[in-house]
Amino acid sequence: MTETTASQVRPVLSPWLQDQLTQLLARRGHAWLLQGPSGLGQYTLGLELARAWLCEAPTQQGACYQCRSCHAVDVRTQADLRTLMPEALALELNWPLDEKTQKDLDDKKRKPSKEIRVEAARDMVAFSQQTRSGGATKVVFIYPAERMNHVTANTLLKTLEEPPGECRFVLASEAAHQLLPTIRSRCQNHTMTWPTESQALRWLQTQGLPLADAAVLLRAAGGRPEDALDLANAGLKAAHWAVLPKAVMRGDVGAVSDATPTQAIATLQKICHDLLALRMGAEPRFFMGADLPTAGTTVSLTQWSKDLMDAARTCEHPYNAGLMFEALVARAQTALRAKE
C-alpha cells in the first residue's frame, strides 16, 4: 500500500474553522490559547493546527494529509505529538494512554480521571526535553485546558514559558477564565470565531441534518454548531425540543427523564433563561417565543435560576436519578406558577 492511499484525503473543514486555521498558520508564536464557549470547534482547530505544524509538506491552508506525519496523527502514533487530556476524554477520542495508566484502568484500580492529572503534565515536561523523532518540531496539545488543576498547571509553567528546543503548544479551552492567569499570560490568545447562522446551518446539513431540524437544534444549542450536532447525535428531536417548556410547566417528568441529570438541568436552565429574557423585553435565545409559556415572575425565575446553578454542582452523583428528575420538575412548576 502506498503512503498516499494509506492516508486520508484532506477533509473539508467548516469555513469558519478553515479561515481561522489559515490565519493562525500565518502568525508566529510557540504557544497558542484557543478560547471560546463550547461548540465552536476548539478541539478540531487545535488538532489541525498541531497537524500542520508537524506536517512534512504543509500549505498555507494546513497539513497535506498525505505524508507520514499526517498518517501518524490519524492513527495516534505521531511520536512528536503529545496530547494532555482527561483520561475519560482521551479514551472517548481514541487517544492512547501511557502503559501504567492503561494497566491501572484495566485492573480497575481507579476510574478514568475527568481532570488532566499532574503525572501527565510531568510526562509532558520530559517529552519536551527529548530529541525530536525526525520532524522540524514537537507539539503539545492540551484540551480542555481548563481541566488542569493548579498543581498540574504550575507543573507546565516553566516549560510553557521557555520550551527546550523546538517545542510548540496549543491549548484549547471552553472556559479560559478558569485557567491560571500565569498560564494565559504565557500564550498568544485566539478567540474562536462564531459562524453566521447560514454557515452553521449549511454545515449541519452536510452532517446529515434536514434544514428544519438543523434550525431548531442550532437554536437549542445557542448558535453553536458542534453542540447542535451533539444534541442530534444524542437523539434529541426538533419536535420534542419545541414542546419541552410547556410539558415541564404541566409537570411532565418524562419530558426530561430520558436525559442525564446534567443534560436535564442544562435544558431547564435554557427554559429559565428564555423566560427571564421575555420578562425583560428581550428575545429568547434557545426556544421560539411561541413555544414558551407565559409563566413565572422575575423574582421566581431569578430564584429558580440560582437553584439550578446549585443543582448543577451536585448532579453528577445523585442518589436516585428518578427522584432527582421529579424534584427538578416540581421546582420548575413552583417557579412557573408563581404570580405577581
Residue ranges and their predicted role:
Residues M1-A52, Q60-Q61, R68-S69, G165-R168, ...:
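Charged, glycine-rich active-site and insertion segments that engage polyanionic ligands
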Residues A126, K158, S185:
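Conserved adenine-binding aromatic site and its adjacent loop/helix in ATP-hydrolyzing domains
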Residues Q129, N154-R168:
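Conserved catalytic/switch belt of AAA+ P-loop NTPases
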Residues R147-M148, E162, Q178:
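Residues immediately C-terminal
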